[in-house]
From Swiss-Prot:
Main localization category: cytoplasm
Family classification: Belongs to the IF-3 family.
Pfam families per the UniProt record, alphabetical: IF3_C, IF3_N
Protein name: Translation initiation factor IF-3
Gene source species: Chlorobium chlorochromatii (strain CaD3)
Function: IF-3 binds to the 30S ribosomal subunit and shifts the equilibrium between 70S ribosomes and their 50S and 30S subunits in favor of the free subunits, thus enhancing the availability of 30S subunits on which protein synthesis initiation begins.
First and last residue of the signal peptide: none
Region (Disordered): 195-226
PANTHER family: TRANSLATION INITIATION FACTOR IF-3, TRANSLATION INITIATION FACTOR IF-3, MITOCHONDRIAL
Lineage: Bacteria, Pseudomonadati, Chlorobiota, Chlorobiia, Chlorobiales
Cytoplasm found in the keyword field: yes
């Protein structure tokens, strides 16, 4: 399976600068924390005298709030911030296995063991309970199965929300929990049971969807060098 493609774009400044600021007056915040409302033309002149740019940081304020900064350095910092965020992103795969409300114990144990393994490897998983034909009248059995899955997978994961019906399918999502996984691995390492690999899933049983997970995301306003 191909890895999800991460596109790299140049930082886009969404704030107006210099001549783009066309309101009659602005509130300028200085590096020492003081602020002053002044005509925009005067603020632009002050920026030029400092060899800096007048940058609007709060366009919806009345009047808009601006600061003095170096536009080139600001764009560089924004680019660096975007690259740092991309480094913290990691490609993961949503793994889905399908069940039926009358799934037998052997099939349940087999598929749940695979879901557990996917979670231990850091993947998000989705258990889909499919109601064929008139079996949709047995919704309670599907919900029962969802609770059994939740209990079994709770040692390595947290359920993401409540089970959700969409048509004749019941979806249950689980997110890996690193602390639980670490504890589980430590306990398992202390046992003397030999490692037995799971039998492979049949291709029609497993559905995979690429996802991009970010460890940190923020929409910070332009930073100041000062």
């Amino acid at each position: 399976m191909k890895k999800p493609k991460v596109t790299t774009q140049k930082p886009k400044l969404t704030y107006r600068v210099n001549e783009q600021i066309r309101v009659p007056e602005v509130r300028v915040i200085f590096t020492d924390g003081t602020q002053k409302v002044m005509p925009t033309l005067e603020a632009r002149r002050m920026a030029e005298e400092r060899n800096q740019d007048l940058i609007e940081v709060q366009p919806n304020a009345a009047p808009p709030v601006c600061k003095f900064d170096n536009l080139g350095k600001l764009l560089y910092k924004m680019d660096k911030r975007d690259k740092d965020l991309k480094k913290k992103q990691k490609a993961t795969t949503l793994k889905e296995l399908r069940f039926h409300p009358n799934t037998d114990k052997h099939d349940f144990d087999f598929k749940t063991a695979h879901l557990e393994e996917f979670l231990r490897k850091g993947n998000r998983v989705r258990a889909t309970i499919v109601f064929l034909g008139r079996s949709i009248i047995y919704k309670d059995k599907g919900l029962e199965l969802a609770e059994r899955l939740t209990e079994r997978l709770s040692i390595v994961s947290n359920r993401d929300g409540d089970p959700k019906f969409e048509g004749k399918k019941l979806f249950v999502y689980f997110d890996p929990d690193k602390k639980k996984i670490d504890t589980y691995e430590r306990i398992k390492a202390k046992t003397s049971q030999p490692f037995v690999p799971l039998a492979p899933l049949s291709p029609e049983d497993l559905i995979e969807e690429p996802e991009l997970e970010s460890e940190s995301d923020s929409d910070a306003e332009p930073e100041s060098d000062n």
